């Protein structure tokens, strides 16, 4: 089959020409337009999520050989969460080539974060099936670019990440409260609780309120993202 002009342009933007063009067509086809003869991208999204995770895990291990699992986990989550995938999808104009049903199109489907993130993962899977893991790896590293280099700083700012997570789900900004102080005056220990608008909370203790807030936010964000998965 031959791809349309807009899909050929999309191939150029992501730097991969498909040997089997139908794989790309399936990757950009939403469930709202699927049929017996036109499969949607849900199964590809499932596979692409795993390919993306493997590429990112390898990249993070290579970038910081001394990092612990606890240090790597928030960096990994920052790179693979739906908000990041959607941002990358927008940068390559994925929304412009999505194949949507009328109702999904009328409701702004081309701009929906979850839909864009899922479709990008489907594209990653399509490249993997079309040309193998190395091609998919090159694609991911190229599209994520400086995000991988910046992820350590981004992951440290867990309060911002948690606020973005909450806002993306229509929740108010997280609330932080110092609930305890212990230890001597010269070396106090502050316990801080963070609370989301959905009632979820997490506590953490540290030598300063700022560090305790960041630790509590990081722990709560990791728990919420694990539930999203």
From Swiss-Prot:
The active site is at 49, 121. It catalyses: Endonucleolytic cleavage to 5'-phosphomonoester. It is found in: Cytoplasm. Pfam families: dsrm, Ribonucleas_3_3. Its EC number is 3.1.26.3. Mg(2+) binds at residues 45, 118, 121. GO terms for molecular function: double-stranded RNA binding; metal ion binding; ribonuclease III activity; rRNA binding. Keywords: Cytoplasm, Endonuclease, Hydrolase, Magnesium, Metal-binding, mRNA processing, Nuclease, RNA-binding, rRNA processing, rRNA-binding, tRNA processing. The keyword Metal-binding applies. Residues 7-132 form the RNase III domain. SMART domains: DSRM, RIBOc. GO terms for biological process: mRNA processing; regulation of gene expression; rRNA processing; tRNA processing. One of its GO terms (cellular component) is cytoplasm. Transmembrane segments: none annotated. Its cofactor is Mg(2+). Residues 157-226 form the DRBM domain. Homodimer. Belongs to the ribonuclease III family. PANTHER family: RIBONUCLEASE 3 (PTHR11207:SF0), RIBONUCLEASE III (PTHR11207). Digests double-stranded RNA. Involved in the processing of primary rRNA transcript to yield the immediate precursors to the large and small rRNAs (23S and 16S). Processes some mRNAs, and tRNAs when they are encoded in the rRNA operon. Processes pre-crRNA and tracrRNA of type II CRISPR loci if present in the organism. NCBIfam families: RNaseIII. This is Ribonuclease 3. It comes from Cereibacter sphaeroides (strain ATCC 17025 / ATH 2.4.3). The lineage of its organism: Bacteria, Pseudomonadati, Pseudomonadota, Alphaproteobacteria, Rhodobacterales.
């Amino acid at each position: 089959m031959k791809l349309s002009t807009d899909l050929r342009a999309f191939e150029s933007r992501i730097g991969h020409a498909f040997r089997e063009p139908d794989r790309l067509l399936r990757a950009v086809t939403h469930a709202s337009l699927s049929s017996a003869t036109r499969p949607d991208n849900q199964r590809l999204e499932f596979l692409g999520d795993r390919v993306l995770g493997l590429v990112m895990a390898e990249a993070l291990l290579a970038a910081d050989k001394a990092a612990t699992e606890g240090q790597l986990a928030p960096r990994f989550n920052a790179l693979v969460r739906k908000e990041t995938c959607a941002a990358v999808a927008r940068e390559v104009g994925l929304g412009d080539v999505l194949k949507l049903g009328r109702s999904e199109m009328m409701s702004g489907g081309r701009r929906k974060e979850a839909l864009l993130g899922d479709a990008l993962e489907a594209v990653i899977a399509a490249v993997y099936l079309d040309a193998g893991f190395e091609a998919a790896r090159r694609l991911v590293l190229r599209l994520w670019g400086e995000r991988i280099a910046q992820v350590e700083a981004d992951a440290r700012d867990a309060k911002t990440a948690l606020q973005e997570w909450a806002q993306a789900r229509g929740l108010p900004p997280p609330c932080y409260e110092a609930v305890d102080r212990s230890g001597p005056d010269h070396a106090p220990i502050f316990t801080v609780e963070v609370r989301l608008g959905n009632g979820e909370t997490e506590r953490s203790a540290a030598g300063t309120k700022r560090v305790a807030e960041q630790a509590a936010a990081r722990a709560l964000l990791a728990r919420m993202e694990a539930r999203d998965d």
